[in-house]
């Protein structure tokens, strides 16, 4: 059966018409919000986190029908198939076993292989952290440069930044992803080649951006005095293609393996996370894995009605497919989680930005929403105006860390107050009558500008303290949310064919930029004109 023919979908359409104009402030009114309160009913713990869903435009019947939709769509079966190592990525004929990277059960798929590679990572990380692994002049490593793009960059960068408070102060970690040379050049201004280790991360070891940066970095080392036969002290590779790593010039002993049954955007738990392990240490890296495993167990064992990834995914579908929301916002009220929104952009949109169903037919309903965000309170002074008073409804995930990870504890009540107040203001709004009172006598014309529609939906995720374990759980929560939505939408969240066409055409355009002339028949007139302008500029 297709999605729109499922009984729960039909029931949700009818229910939506009944509930679409309901007001959150009415549901929270004292005469309606009796024990157990709405907040008590709709706050769910799991995996060391808690989620307050009460400020969403849902009632008990909405959740009942959404959970039934998950059952009708086969969420439980697809979840179990993924954990069992079955082929859940049919377009590439692969399993998706990122969960095996943090499993503790010796019977988990590839357990021995995963454990052996992690032990190799730990030995290397300890050598770098202790100073026993040195550069070619005998100096200890003080800078690590991670070169990768997409999943080989976004996840490790996000985690290293988030866990800065538990990282060693002896080593600075830098991330280079963009093929724009400015990205690498700015990092090279900050480092000494005698004290720098490069981690080159690419599943194929042929990725254009990564290999361009890797070659430039290798040339930089040699130009600054590192003998070519000593580069092994400064380069390691992470790849599913070890032969290509060795061909590049990295010593075979310096190759760490990733596997084709782990997608790039799900890979920070593997050797792709080597920069994380060097920064925070093997023991803390194990805690990161343990937190993800906590959420894995919650996802597998909790009933759907009390299952955080399931509910987060279903509520997202409620807004995307019934309310017609085009985007959703992630607002972590934590500077440590600065890079979480950009990480989630790839996780959500590269996974679920698809139009083809698993059977090859095309969907007739929206799939992935545009995912975006900025840490609080910065966003309040940038785009919250639109969230409060614009005509577009944007569902929001607020993320609040209840205890600070830094010594400036007096800032924290202000941060939390802003987070909670924003969710309350978005829910309550301000009526025209209330606005008239705020405007005051003689300022009737100002009142419409002081109104707030309210009824804007938000979820607040609560993290007691930002530790490797709670961060691991938070990341895994969103990983599993993506699977839930993909299953309901009947799409494959583990491939990314959408990145291919531009890469293919990019090679043609790159060749044309250095050619003597460009055949106008090769491109449309706009692209031809752009190439010609760029050719002229590059010759100057």
UniProtKB/Swiss-Prot annotation:
Pathway it belongs to?
Carbohydrate biosynthesis; gluconeogenesis; Carbohydrate degradation; glycolysis; D-glyceraldehyde 3-phosphate and glycerone phosphate from D-glucose: step 2/4
Q: Which GO terms describe its biological process?
A: gluconeogenesis; glucose 6-phosphate metabolic process; glycolytic process
E.C. number, please? 5.3.1.9
Q: Where in the cell is it found?
A: Cytoplasm
The superkingdom listed in its UniProt entry is Bacteria
* GO CC, any one term: cytosol
Q: Which residues form the active site?
A: 350 (proton donor), 381, 503
Q: Which cysteines are joined by disulfide bonds?
A: none
Kindly state which reaction or reactions the protein catalyses.
alpha-D-glucose 6-phosphate = beta-D-fructose 6-phosphate
Keywords (alphabetical) are:
Cytoplasm, Gluconeogenesis, Glycolysis, Isomerase
GO MF terms held by the record? carbohydrate derivative binding; glucose-6-phosphate isomerase activity; monosaccharide binding
What's the stated role of this polypeptide?
Catalyzes the reversible isomerization of glucose-6-phosphate to fructose-6-phosphate.
Q: Give the family, as the similarity comment puts it.
A: Belongs to the GPI family.
Instruction: Give the PANTHER family listed for this entry.
Output: GLUCOSE-6-PHOSPHATE ISOMERASE
- Protein name in UniProt: Glucose-6-phosphate isomerase
Could you tell me the gene encoding this protein?
Answer: pgi
């Amino acid at each position: 059966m297709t999605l729109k023919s499922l009984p729960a979908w039909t029931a949700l359409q009818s229910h939506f018409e009944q509930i679409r104009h309901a007001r959150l402030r009415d549901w929270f009114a004292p005469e309606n919000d009796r024990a157990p309160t709405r907040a008590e009913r709709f706050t769910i713990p799991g995996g060391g986190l808690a989620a307050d869903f009460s400020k969403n435009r849902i009632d008990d019947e909405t959740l009942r029908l959404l959970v039934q939709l998950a059952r009708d769509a086969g969420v439980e079966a697809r979840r179990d198939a993924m954990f069992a190592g079955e082929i859940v990525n049919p377009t590439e004929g692969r399993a998706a076993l990122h969960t095996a990277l943090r499993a503790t059960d010796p019977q988990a798929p590839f357990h021995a292989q995963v454990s052996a590679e992690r032990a190799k990572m730990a030995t290397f990380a300890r050598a770098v952290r202790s100073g026993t692994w040195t550069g070619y002049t005998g100096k200890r490593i003080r800078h690590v440069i991670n070169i990768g793009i997409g999943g080989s960059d976004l996840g490790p960068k996000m985690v290293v930044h988030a866990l800065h408070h538990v990282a060693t102060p002896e080593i600075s970690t830098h991330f280079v992803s963009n093929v724009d040379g400015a990205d690498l050049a700015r990092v090279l201004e900050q480092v000494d080649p005698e004290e720098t280790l490069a981690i080159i991360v690419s599943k194929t070891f042929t990725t254009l951006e990564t290999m361009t940066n890797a070659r430039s970095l290798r040339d930089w080392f040699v130009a600054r005095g590192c003998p070519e036969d000593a580069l092994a002290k400064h380069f390691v590779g992470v790849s599913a293609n070890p032969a290509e790593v060795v061909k590049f010039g990295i010593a075979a002993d310096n190759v760490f393996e990733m596997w084709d049954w782990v997608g790039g955007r799900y890979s920070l738990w593997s050797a792709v996370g080597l920069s994380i392990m060097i920064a925070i240490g093997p023991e803390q890296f194990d805690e990161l894995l343990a937190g993800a495993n906590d959420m894995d167990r919650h996802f597998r064992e909790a009933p759907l009605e009390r299952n955080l990834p399931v509910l987060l995914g279903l509520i997202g579908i409620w807004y995307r497919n019934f309310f017609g929301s085009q985007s959703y916002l992630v607002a972590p009220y934590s500077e440590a989680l600065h890079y979480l929104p950009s990480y989630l952009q790839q996780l959500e949109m590269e996974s679920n930005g698809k139009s083809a169903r698993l059977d090859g037919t095309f969907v007739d309903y929206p799939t992935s929403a545009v995912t975006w965000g900025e840490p609080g309170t910065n966003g309040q002074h940038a785009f919250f105006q639109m969230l409060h008073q614009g005509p577009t409804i944007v569902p929001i995930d607020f993320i609040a860390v209840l205890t600070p990870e830094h010594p400036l504890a007096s800032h924290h009540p202000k941060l939390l107050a802003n987070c909670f107040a924003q969710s309350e203001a978005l829910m309550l709004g301000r009526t025209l009558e209330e606005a008239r009172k705020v405007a005051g006598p003689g300022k009737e014309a100002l009142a419409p500008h002081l109104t707030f529609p309210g009824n804007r939906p938000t979820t607040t995720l609560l993290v007691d303290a930002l530790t490797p374990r709670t961060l691991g759980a938070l990341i895994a929560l969103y990983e599993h949310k993506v699977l839930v939505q993909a299953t309901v939408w009947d799409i494959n969240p583990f491939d990314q064919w959408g990145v291919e066409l531009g890469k293919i055409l990019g090679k043609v355009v790159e060749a044309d930029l250095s050619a003597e002339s460009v055949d106008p028949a090769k491109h449309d007139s706009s692209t031809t004109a752009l190439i010609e302008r760029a050719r002229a500029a590059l010759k100057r």
